[in-house]
């Protein structure tokens, strides 16, 4: 199977602790002092959030904790009200989503966005529009990776919810991101589709950073090395995923008192 991505000349980033930015070279995505409010309601108040090349970083928390707001601010789909965001040492706080996509920050959406009047292949081509010299094989490789190569000429509107999720991922991958932001990628998927998606995400290149907003703890455990817990827009705790999952305070806050059964809610 062909791969969507290629290692560029500087090679694979060296190993580091999750969330530890290579500050000597300014590599990574760094948000500082982010604060966002809707009217009088503050939905996010975060001191720092860092993503280094190759990180697998989950963001969890109850509904309304500010998870999707954080992702939208990182992607540029929501304008930053307060705070700064840098990417590889460059200030991007005022840059919009198209600029960030060109720079290497891709994303999927909580509700998959497709162009219903386009074919599946044309939707993926749209995902890589900012790469002016992108070879035709890149959209095809993205479809191949997510298992939709046989649907390339289908109208996007004809896809099932599960296939739309895969298409949303293919669109993001066609942009050849360095940082991939995933907003509840398994929401509404069957167990079979969830397993398939986990396999796909597990085969992404090691240099690609993944930030995952997710409610399903078994998905978080499978994908993320590092987990940040948000509550009322603030950082409740963070650390290695296994440690966070075992924290009784996190269980009480997020999983409830139902133990392992609650992890599937």
What is each stretch, according to the model?
Residues 2-265:
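Glycine-rich phosphate-binding loops of nucleotide-dependent enzymes
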């Amino acid at each position: 199977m062909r791969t969507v991505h290629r290692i560029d000349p500087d090679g694979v980033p060296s190993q580091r602790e999750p969330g530890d930015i290579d500050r000597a070279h300014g590599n990574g995505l760094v948000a500082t002092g982010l604060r966002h409010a809707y009217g009088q309601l503050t939905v996010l108040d975060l001191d720092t959030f860092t993503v280094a090349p190759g990180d697998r970083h989950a963001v969890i928390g109850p509904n309304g904790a500010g998870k999707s707001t954080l992702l939208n601010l990182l992607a540029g789909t929501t304008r930053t009200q307060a705070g700064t965001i840098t990417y590889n040492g460059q200030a991007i706080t005022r840059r919009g989503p198209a600029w960030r996509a060109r720079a290497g920050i891709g994303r999927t959406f909580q509700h998959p966005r497709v162009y219903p009047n386009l074919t599946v292949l044309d939707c993926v081509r749209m995902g890589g529009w900012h790469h002016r010299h992108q070879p035709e094989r890149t959209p095809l490789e993205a479809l191949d990776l997510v298992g939709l190569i046989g649907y390339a000429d289908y109208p996007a509107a004809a896809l099932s919810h599960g296939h739309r999720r895969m298409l949303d991922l293919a669109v993001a991958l066609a942009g050849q991101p360095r940082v991939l932001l995933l907003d509840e990628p398994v929401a509404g998927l069957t167990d079979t589709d969830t397993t398939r998606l986990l396999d796909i995400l597990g085969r992404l290149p090691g240099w690609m950073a993944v930030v995952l907003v997710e409610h399903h703890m078994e998905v978080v455990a499978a994908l993320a090395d590092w987990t940040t817990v948000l509550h009322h827009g603030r950082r409740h705790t963070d650390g290695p995923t296994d440690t966070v999952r075992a924290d009784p305070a996190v269980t009480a806050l997020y999983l409830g008192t139902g133990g392992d059964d609650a992890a599937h809610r």
